[in-house]
Amino acid sequence: MRDLGMDAQLMSLCDVYDPDYKKVIDESVSSFVAQFKGNPWLIGYFVSNEPSWINNETRLCQMILNGTERPIKKALETYLAKNGDTVPNRRRFILETFDTFLSTVSEALKKYDPDHLNLGIRFGDPDTLGEDLLEVCKRHFDVFSFNCYQLKPDAAMLDRAAQILDLPMIVGEFHFGTIDRGLAQSLWQVDSQAERGVAYRYYVENAYSHPNFIGTGYFQWCDQDITGRFDGENYNCGLVDVTDRPYRDLVNAVSESSHNLFQIHSGESRPYDRQPKNARGHELVPDLWNE
């Protein structure tokens, strides 16, 4: 979703102390969901993606205090004067602000499109999210979402999130790529197009073996341009290339897994157990162009 009042100067937090914030969210949600109401192919809406204030609450509070006069600054000054300027209290203020924001968005979604789900915010690694933050999410989300660039979602990580949240879970982003088409390595890379298919099946089928798991969002449909997107990222991460030619090994793997997911999720079948050879995260290896 867009235009919900999340402010770059607040590290993607919303100033819920502004008297117009409810109106902004209400109008934005109403306008955005109008095009999707009644669409049976849509399951729900993501509210946001990887907010940068997560685990930076103390820093964000200092930025607010050092910043220009605005409603959230006055509210923070009042809160700290009453409760004490401590690290826990700064975090508590940010989480209470976040709670108010999520509550307002949730109310608007139920008002304007009650037939679709609130898929929450696509966080990063759930293990980096405190239990207090997860409890806030639990109150407002229908589904807990996170991006997960790993060989597969860690079972212990999923168990922890499931125990705290008791919600279904979706991976918002993951992918595998290689460099044989002249593009850069992806956030998780393998040695060939064939291994991309192996990696896909291993990731998705093992994810679906968890009882709380209901979906994986592959990033992305099409390769990125060789000249790069706005930040220069130019990965071989697509199901198709930039001229819409499918990567057959990957597409066949998607089809194969899709036929097995219900049986895997119900425990009737075991997930694919062949790991891709030499799969590695982007940050762990040198650029393969230099090898």
Question: Which sequence ranges carry the predicted segments?
Answer:
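Glycoside hydrolase catalytic-domain groove-lining segments
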Residues: R92-E107, K111-S186, R201, E205
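Short, solvent-exposed loop/turn and secondary-structure capping segments
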Residues: N55-L60, R181-G182, G228-R229
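Substrate-binding cleft of secreted/luminal carbohydrate-active enzymes
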Residues: L42-G44, N49, F174, W188-V240, ...
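Aromatic-rich peripheral "rim/lid" segments of glycoside hydrolase catalytic domains that contact
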Residues: Q62-E77, F219-E291
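Proline-centered flexible-loop/turn and helix-kink motifs
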Residues: G38-P40, P114, L165-D166, P211-N212
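Active-site clefts of carbohydrate-active enzymes
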Residues: R2-D15, L80-N89, G124-D125, G130-E131, ...
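Polysaccharide-binding and catalytic clefts of secreted carbohydrate-active enzymes
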Residues: Q9-V16, N39-D132
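Soluble or luminal CAZymes and related metallo-dependent hydrolases
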Residues: L13, Y17-S28, T86-F101, P153, ...
